[in-house]
UniProtKB/Swiss-Prot annotation:
A single GO BP: 'de novo' pyrimidine nucleobase biosynthetic process
This protein's name: Aspartate carbamoyltransferase regulatory chain
A molecular function GO annotation: metal ion binding
Cofactor: Zn(2+)
Function: Involved in allosteric regulation of aspartate carbamoyltransferase.
Length: 139
C-alpha cells in the first residue's frame, strides 16, 4: 500500500493502533468534510503497531484534547512537502467540553448548557474527575 506525502497540512503520528477514528471524533474533525488519509495498524518499532492521520490543508487541532485521547501521539506540521515543526501534546491539567459526566445526579447532566469540566487527579492512571461532582471520567 502506498500513501503519498502531503504538501501542506499536519500528520498525527504514533496514534494508538485502531483508535484514529475515535481521535478524529474527539478532535471534532469530520472525515466526510476533510481531506485526510488514515493509516491504521502500521508497523511501529516503538509500539508494535500504530495509526497515522494525515490531514491536508491547515487544520487547527487542540493539542490538549489530543494529549488526553492519544498521549503518545506526535504532530508534524508540513509546509511545501517538508516537516517544518514537530509538536508533542501534553496531558492537560483541565479539559473542558471533551467528555461528559456519567453521574446522573451531576448538575451538568441535569442542567443543559453547563460546560463539562474535568481536572487531572492522577497522571500515571490518566484519571480525571468532574469539577462539579468529582465523578471519575470515562473515555
Amino acid at each position: 500500500m502506498e500513501v503519498t506525502s502531503i504538501q501542506n497540512g499536519i500528520i498525527i503520528d504514533h496514534v494508538p493502533a485502531g483508535t484514529s477514528l475515535k481521535v478524529l471524533e474527539y478532535l471534532k474533525i469530520d472525515p466526510a468534510k476533510t481531506k485526510l488519509a488514515l493509516i491504521m495498524n502500521a508497523d511501529s518499532k516503538r509500539y508494535g503497531s500504530k495509526d497515522i492521520i494525515k490531514i491536508e490543508d491547515d487544520k487547527d487541532i487542540d493539542l490538549d484534547v489530543l494529549g488526553f485521547v492519544a498521549r503518545q501521539a506526535t504532530v508534524d506540521v508540513v509546509r511545501g512537502g517538508k516537516i517544518v515543526e514537530k509538536k508533542q501534546p501534553n496531558l492537560p491539567e483541565h479539559i473542558v467540553g471533551v467528555i461528559s459526566c456519567v453521574n446522573p445526579r451531576c448538575v451538568t447532566t441535569a442542567e443543559p448548557g453547563i460546560k463539562q469540566m474535568f481536572h487531572l487527579v492522577h497522571s500515571e492512571r490518566l484519571e480525571y474527575r468532574c469539577d462539579y461532582c468529582d465523578e471519575e471520567a470515562k473515555l
